[in-house]
Amino acid sequence: MSKHSLIENLKKQIEPIVEGLNYELYHIEFVKEGKENYLRIYIDSENGVSLEGCEKVSRAVSELLDDIDPIQESYYLEVSSPGIDRVLYTDKHLEKYKGYNIVLNLYSSIDKKKKYEGELVDFNENEINIKVEENIVTIPREKISKTTLKGEL
């Protein structure tokens, strides 16, 4: 099974558990760091995410994973909040943070810049528009390697 298929399968099974505990399943990733594998589950809530909330979700998801055993190799399960400088993975995330400052990291330079920071104005399937100072800058989505919320306290 491909990593993408694994993640999609896990999402379908984990999402109802997370929602049943009054959290949103923000993102799932399965990564190898050094010799270790990690299944990372990011949860969110309008009221924030507490350590106790992460523990509840971790226990519930761990039970499911023990039952269905979807991953053949050993791994560590981590459950956390996406954090203040969260990566915006989906259109749903972009929609939620319209009007907020974001950082766009690019695969290749546009006007000699590989990083743009500004207010998320709008987006569609092909591009993201941000306001930089008083100008609207349009960045093709295919050029974007990572979109991050600019955390502000």
Swiss-Prot record:
Pfam families named in the record: DUF150_C (PF17384), RimP_N (PF02576)
GO biological process: ribosomal small subunit assembly; translation
Major localisation: cytoplasm
GO cellular component terms given for this protein: cytosol
Entry keyword set: Cytoplasm, Ribosome biogenesis
Signal peptide extent: none
Subcellular location: Cytoplasm
Membership in a protein family: Belongs to the RimP family.
HAMAP family (alphabetical): RimP (MF_01077)
Reported function: Required for maturation of 30S ribosomal subunits.
Name of the molecule in the record: Ribosome maturation factor RimP
Species of origin: Clostridium botulinum (strain 657 / Type Ba4)
